[in-house]
C-alpha cells in the first residue's frame, strides 16, 4: 500500500542506478539475463501452483470437501517447495541477499506486532462502509454478535468447515507465500520496488485464470506493497483473509438500502480515512529494517525510496 501514498508514489519512477550490480561484478549473468531468470522463475511458480490443483482428476465441484482436501495437499506441497525456487534463482543470478532466506521471505520477529495489526487495521478502515452494511443487516445486536464471534464453539465449527479453512487460512497463506514472499524478492532487483508491486498480480492472475472455468468470483487486489513496506508475510496473509471474508463491497445494495445515506457516508469516510492514514501506517520505520533493502543494495539498487 505504500506504493499509493507518500514516498511510495516515487516507487513507480525509480531510476536504475548506474552502479554495477554485485552479480555482474562477481562475473555473474548480466541484468538482462537476471530479469529473464526472475520472470521464468515466477512463471514456473505460478504454473506449478495452478497445476497442483488439477493433479487430482474428479468430476466433483470445487466446493466438495473431498476436492478441497486434495487441493489442500497439493498447494501445501507446492508452497513448501517454493523457497527452493528462490534458492535456485539466487544461484543462477549470483545475487546474494545478505540475509537468511526466511528473513527475506518475511518470516522474522522484528516488528511483527505492528506488521500484523496496522495493515489489517488500515484494510478494515477501507471497508468501513461494508462493515457498517454488514452490521445493519445483521439480525442480532452488537453484544450478541460479539458473543458468537468469541464463542469457542463457533471457532470449532469454522475449523471443521473445509470451505472456511480454504478461504480464510489455506488460500491466503499459500498464495501470499508463493506470489508475494517468493516472487517479490526475485522481481525487485530486476524491475525495482514499484514495478514489482504491479508485476506480481500478473502472475497472480495467471494462477487464478482457471476460476473462469469453475466460478466467477471476486478476488481482492494485490497486497504486495504491504510486504514491501513491512517486510513481513503475516500482514498480507491477514489482509488477504479479511478481504476473502468480506468479498466485493455491495455498492448496488448500499444504494438501495433503507439507511443508504449513513451507509454511503460510511463508504466515503472509509475511503477518506484510508487515504489519510495510508502513508503513516505503511511507513517502513514502524516495522524495523527491511530485508528487501539489503537485497537491492547487493543487487546494485540502494537508492529505492523505501530504502533511503
UniProtKB/Swiss-Prot annotation:
Location, primary (coarse class): endoplasmic reticulum
Positions of post-translational N-acetylalanine modification: 2
Sorted UniProt keywords: Acetylation, Endoplasmic reticulum, Hydrolase, Membrane, Protease, Transmembrane, Transmembrane helix, Ubl conjugation
Protein location: Endoplasmic reticulum membrane
EC identifiers of the protein: 3.4.26.1
Superkingdom of source: Eukaryota
Class of this enzyme: hydrolase
Activity regulation as described: Deubiquitination by USP17L2/USP17 negatively regulates the proteolytic activity toward Ras GTPases.
Cellular-component GO terms for this entry: endoplasmic reticulum membrane
Residues annotated as the enzyme's active site: 175, 208
GO biological process per UniProt: CAAX-box protein processing
PTM comment: Ubiquitinated. Undergoes 'Lys-48'- and 'Lys-63'-linked ubiquitination. 'Lys-48' ubiquitination induces its degradation. Deubiquitinated by USP17L2/USP17 that cleaves 'Lys-63'-linked ubiquitin chains.
Cleavable signal peptide: none
GO molecular function: endopeptidase activity; metalloendopeptidase activity
Membrane keyword on record: yes
Ranges annotated as spanning the membrane: 25-45, 75-95, 112-132, 186-206, 233-253, 262-282
Site (Transition state stabilizer): 240, 244
Catalytic activity of the protein: Hydrolyzes the peptide bond -P2-(S-farnesyl or geranylgeranyl)C-P1'-P2'-P3'-COOH where P1' and P2' are amino acids with aliphatic sidechains and P3' is any C-terminal residue
Family per record: Belongs to the peptidase U48 family.
Cross-referenced PANTHER family: CAAX PRENYL PROTEASE 2, PROTEASE U48 CAAX PRENYL PROTEASE RCE1
Functional summary from the UniProt entry: Protease involved in the processing of a variety of prenylated proteins containing the C-terminal CAAX motif, where C is a cysteine modified with an isoprenoid lipid, A is an aliphatic amino acid and X is any C-terminal amino acid. Proteolytically removes the C-terminal three residues of farnesylated and geranylated proteins, leaving the prenylated cysteine as the new C-terminus. Is able to process K-Ras, N-Ras, H-Ras, RAP1B and G-gamma-1.
UniProt name for this protein: CAAX prenyl protease 2
Organism: Bos taurus
Upper taxonomic lineage: Eukaryota, Metazoa, Chordata, Craniata, Vertebrata
Gene giving rise to this polypeptide: RCE1
